């Protein structure tokens, strides 16, 4: 008798995706982040669902309802902080996952890569709208500043902003619609994840060497199920350390002050995971230029496959590209630091230099390094 997992229509899909999936035998811990992102998404949807049961999306009661969740709901504080810090873990895993894709040349799987970019935008949009919901000072002013950027779009800008706001300022209508979108988007993300995996399983996983591994595949279960389980354990440990010991470490104290349209916070800044993009936005003294640079800081990922000049797929055997990659990582950390600093003398210049360097490395230096490495191969 054939095993039910190989014949049952539903179990067959699970079997081909998680059990009998042929997987390269040499993929490293950098390949754990895909499954960790899946875990993060599940954690966020579950904690978010329980928060939505107690939250009210009204300007008068939103802040109080979050306080009520933390004080009066059973383990409400835990659910709230798991959700808030879960978002941070989500972005750590996201950036690691994208970094892995760039380093090992996974972007040559075009469909998988492009769906991944769409997923990145969707997660960023969801996180932004979620940050507005507690209706603290930083929520309100963050929403005002970021939505206002759309007014830089020629001709339709102002109309578009008022349409998104549902009025002439960020108010009740804005909060209500942001809550609606924040609730629905994770499910759209989950659907996109399925498409992402569908395209990935068409080609199979890449591996650190970048060399086709069809001749050396092993079943996903038990080898990678146990490896993923270890990753899950590490992620949950890290998340619980954050939630139980310093839940507000990554948050902003301004968000413990209820939103007040008459009082602007001195330093408006987004959550830490958007600071690099915010620094790029601020480093251009022109509104439209800044917005374009902001969008391009993520969209540049879509151009990376077109700029792949190397004869090798992975950076494993390409020392010049490796150095550039780690300089890019250092540059992104610098931008993250600058994004959290006030707009004054040394920080403005550092931000501008770091922004130029970011685009220069990706668009010019990396393709050049690839061509040099191709030449070295012939020696």
UniProtKB/Swiss-Prot annotation:
Free-text comment on the cofactor: Binds 2 heme b groups non-covalently.
Needed co-factor(s): heme b
Membrane topology designation: Multi-pass membrane protein
Keyword Electron transport: yes
Subunit (UniProt): The cytochrome bc1 complex contains 11 subunits: 3 respiratory subunits (MT-CYB, CYC1 and UQCRFS1), 2 core proteins (UQCRC1 and UQCRC2) and 6 low-molecular weight proteins (UQCRH/QCR6, UQCRB/QCR7, UQCRQ/QCR8, UQCR10/QCR9, UQCR11/QCR10 and a cleavage product of UQCRFS1). This cytochrome bc1 complex then forms a dimer.
BP terms from Gene Ontology: mitochondrial electron transport, ubiquinol to cytochrome c
Protein family: Belongs to the cytochrome b family.
Name listed for the protein in its UniProt record: Cytochrome b
Record keyword Iron present: yes
Top-rank lineage group of the source organism: Eukaryota
Other remarks in the entry: Heme 1 (or BL or b562) is low-potential and absorbs at about 562 nm, and heme 2 (or BH or b566) is high-potential and absorbs at about 566 nm.
Chain's gene name: MT-CYB
Binding site for a ubiquinone: 201
InterPro entries registered for this protein in UniProt: Cyt_b/b6_C, Cyt_b/b6_C_sf, Cyt_b/b6_N, Cytb/b6-like_sf, Cytochrome_b, Cytochrome_b_C_euk/bac, Cytochrome_b_N_euk/bac, Di-haem_cyt_TM
GO molecular function, one term: metal ion binding
GO cellular component annotations of the record: mitochondrial inner membrane; respiratory chain complex III
């Amino acid at each position: 008798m054939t095993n039910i997992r190989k014949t049952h229509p539903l179990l067959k899909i699970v079997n081909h995706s998680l059990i009998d999936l042929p997987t390269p035998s040499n993929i490293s811990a950098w390949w754990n982040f895909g499954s960790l992102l899946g875990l993060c998404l599940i954690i966020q949807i579950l904690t978010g669902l329980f928060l939505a049961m107690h939250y009210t999306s009204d300007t008068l009661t939103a802040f109080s309802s979050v306080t009520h969740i933390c004080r009066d709901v059973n383990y409400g504080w835990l659910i709230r902080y798991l959700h808030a810090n879960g978002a941070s873990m989500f972005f750590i895993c996201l950036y690691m996952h994208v970094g892995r894709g760039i380093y090992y040349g996974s972007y040559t799987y075009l469909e998988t890569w492009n769906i991944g970019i769409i997923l990145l935008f969707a997660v960023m949009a969801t996180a932004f709208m979620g940050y507005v919901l507690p209706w603290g000072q930083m929520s309100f002013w963050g929403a005002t500043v970021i939505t206002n950027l759309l007014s830089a779009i020629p001709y339709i800008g102002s109309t578009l902003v008022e349409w998104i706001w549902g009025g002439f300022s960020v108010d009740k209508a804005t909060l209500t619609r942001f809550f609606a979108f924040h609730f629905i988007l994770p499910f759209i993300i989950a659907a996109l994840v399925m498409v992402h995996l569908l395209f990935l399983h068409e080609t199979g996983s890449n591996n650190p060497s970048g060399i086709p591994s069809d001749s050396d595949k092993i079943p996903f279960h038990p080898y990678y199920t146990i490896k993923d389980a270890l990753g899950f354990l590490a992620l949950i440990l890290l998340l619980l350390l954050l939630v139980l010991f310093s839940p507000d470490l990554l948050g902003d104290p301004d968000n413990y002050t209820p939103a007040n349209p008459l009082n602007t916070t001195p330093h408006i800044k987004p959550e830490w995971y958007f600071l690099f993009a915010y620094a790029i936005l601020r480093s251009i003294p022109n509104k439209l230029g800044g917005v374009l640079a902001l969008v391009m800081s993520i969209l540049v990922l879509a151009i990376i496959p077109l700029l792949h000049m190397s004869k090798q797929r992975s950076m494993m055997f390409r020392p010049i590209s490796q150095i550039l990659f780690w300089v890019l990582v250092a540059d992104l950390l610098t931008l993250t630091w600058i994004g959290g600093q006030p707009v004054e003398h040394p920080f403005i210049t550092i931000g501008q230099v770091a922004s130029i360097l970011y685009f220069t490395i990706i668009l010019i230096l990396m393709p050049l390094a690839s061509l040099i490495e191709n030449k070295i191969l012939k020696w």
